[in-house]
């Protein structure tokens, strides 16, 4: 029977084969006509790659069927070069965890009375729980940037 083999260039080769011929035999016939080694050939029929050990009848290849010949590609993707950094990586800032940090804001005297060590911000957007930083001559809120200046007798 006669089958056709279409190459990548669009050229069609005609081969005389039998249904009992193996795919290896077909590849050998293509090598005789085109000079392409069988290990570089891949034959495709009905969207499937044909395996060397099987016959044409296994794939239901009949007379005047068309096989597509593509070349086997060796290797994979291009190997990427490892990046080499010229400056060392910046160390990420780690927040220090202070156990019972609330104890820094209040003081308990011997009578059991609680005294606030820091002043809470009075700004509208701040509210309770936002303490102001103590400077030499003022209190400063880091959130709303309000400042309360001491008078000499206020300290």
Swiss-Prot record:
Q: Tell me the superkingdom of the source.
A: Eukaryota
Record has Nuclease as a keyword: no
Single GO cellular component annotation? cytoplasm
Q: Which of UniProt's keywords are assigned here?
A: Cytoplasm, Isopeptide bond, Metal-binding, Nucleus, Ribonucleoprotein, Ribosomal protein, Ubl conjugation, Zinc, Zinc-finger
Q: Where is the signal peptide?
A: none
What is one Gene Ontology biological process annotated in the Swiss-Prot or TrEMBL record? translation
What are the recorded GO MF terms, alphabetically? structural constituent of ribosome; zinc ion binding
Cross-link Glycyl lysine isopeptide (Gly-Lys) (interchain with K-? in acceptor proteins): residue positions? 76
Which family is this protein grouped under? In the N-terminal section; belongs to the ubiquitin family. In the C-terminal section; belongs to the eukaryotic ribosomal protein eS31 family.
The name of this protein is Ubiquitin-ribosomal protein eS31 fusion protein
Source organism? Manduca sexta (Tobacco hawkmoth)
């Amino acid at each position: 029977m006669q089958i056709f083999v279409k190459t990548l260039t669009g050229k069609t080769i005609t081969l005389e084969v039998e249904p009992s011929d193996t795919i290896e035999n077909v590849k050998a016939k293509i090598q005789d006509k085109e000079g392409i080694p069988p290990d570089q050939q891949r034959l495709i029929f009905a969207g499937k790659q044909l395996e060397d050990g099987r016959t044409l009848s296994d794939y239901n290849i009949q007379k005047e069927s068309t096989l597509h010949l593509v070349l086997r590609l060796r290797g994979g993707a291009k190997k990427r070069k490892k990046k080499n950094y010229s400056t060392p990586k910046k160390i990420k800032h780690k927040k220090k965890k202070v156990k019972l940090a609330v104890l820094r804001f209040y003081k308990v005297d011997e009578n059991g009375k609680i005294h606030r060590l820091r002043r809470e911000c009075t700004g509208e957007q701040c509210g309770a729980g936002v303490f102001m930083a103590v400077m030499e001559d003022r209190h400063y809120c880091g959130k709303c940037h309000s400042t309360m200046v001491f008078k000499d007798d206020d300290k």
